[in-house]
């Protein structure tokens, strides 16, 4: 896609780019009319710096890991100390699903979306707390960035962002103008990305979108099992198949769910830091949406069919569990915190590699 995006810019000189010239057996397809363009604009920056197309994509993936870790660090810093924020950042970077996105699926847009998730939550929280318009400005840009990066990630993230907003609004003075301002920010972000959204909305009837929600892409066929989510140590470079015999991992992360459950026990016993329960509850609900028991929700909310794969909600479990886990340093000795981080790296760092190393010159 990076190569086709560049070819579209150079050959057609169109802005924004709509057409992938060589797709569709050489006839071309309106790929960038429906897929977010922002990842490929970033890729063009690396191309300007004289990186090859392949190296530009690699650099983009590296950027997603580094920048997303920094983003959640600043979010977690609003709740925990520097130590807690660092813990959250490390858990966010080394969640198994992050490796799936990069090394198994090669899902650049979804990987890039991991940057915007914590930024949006941060700016919502800061605006509600301070009522400063600068946070509203950055919120608009972040929402537009997520929209232009991966519209399915926006669909997945939006309900959680709304719950996040209402929770912190309820904790504040509950001023109605805060809701009005945040709603206006959401609308402004849609206007900012209208050059992409309007064609998606009004030209979808010109393509066969029904094929994206039926057959192999029917979400009913891709629920994860409890074993896959919590117990399995399987790692593969295949894909999501019908039924439980998938050839890729849907693991939440052993350290992620175990530490999260330990935190819940500590919070319930000590009866403090209730926001930890909020973060972990959102993460657990996201995990629930990956499982077949959530089928009634998927059938009720029709637009969810476009998400295709319920395990995509591992993006949200990774986000909120990592955020909550940052508080673990409050309840255990410093040496145990270091042990937990070492265990995380030992268990997960080994999956951050490709299936086959190829020497391409």
Predicted regions and their residues:
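Membrane-embedded transmembrane-helix bundle of lipid-linked glycan/lipid transferases
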Residues: 1-360
